Structures are given as structure tokens and as C-alpha cells.
Amino acid sequence: AFLYKDKKESQEILTTVFDRFPILKERKNQDAATLSGGEQQMLAMGRALMSRPKLLLLDEPSMGLAPIFIKEIFSIIEEIKNQGTTVLLIEQNAKMALGIADRGYVLETGKIVLEDSGPELLNSPDIQKAYLGG
């Protein structure tokens, strides 16, 4: 874990994380294993944000989550992105991912077959038909 020597700075960062994930503040004394899947995902993101990264890597953050948590997680990811942190997102929920992406890449068997802006890929009839069920 990343440690700050300055307790004040550490507390400020923790306050920022709790502001972004208020449910974690309510559950701060609860064992992580007893949190719901969405809460565990928020905890993982909060822990990663404690180090104030310039780049945040997220691998399938919506996997196994209830729809209400998926919307919340993507809203938080978009907020993190809009505040200046670069987010590299690997996600099978292409509609949600492309909806917040500046840039998107379509991979097939490990190779990039298409790349464009998130909105362009999301609105492409070919992409809709081939990958988004449209």
C-alpha cells in the first residue's frame, strides 16, 4: 500500500475518496469481504485513487455487478476521467464503455481491428450490427 508521511495529506486524500464513494465512509469499519460486489469494486477503485495516479487501469469493472452499480461505477469512472486522470478501461459492456471513452479500440483474437473516438464507434452502424446487438 502507498503510504504518506504527512498525516494531513493522507487524511485529505481519504476525505476525497469518501466524498466520491460515500457508501465506503458508511462502511469503513466493515470487513471488505462482507461488502457487496459493487461496494468491493468501489473499494478497489478508492484504494487505487489513494495514490493519486495519473493513469488508472480498470479491467472489467462492471463484471458481475447489479445494473444499478454498473451505472454508478461508470459515472464515477467518467468523473475520474473528467478530473484529469487517464483511464485505461478494458470492458465487455461496450455501450457503457464507449459512452464515456475518448478513444475506443475493438479487438478480435488479440488484434486491434478498429479504432476511433468513443462516440464514433458507438454510433457506427457497422459496430452496432457486429458488436452491440443493433
Positions of the model-derived regions?
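ABC-type ATPase nucleotide-binding domains, specifically the catalytic core motifs of the NBD
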Residues: A1-E12, R20-K25, D116, G134
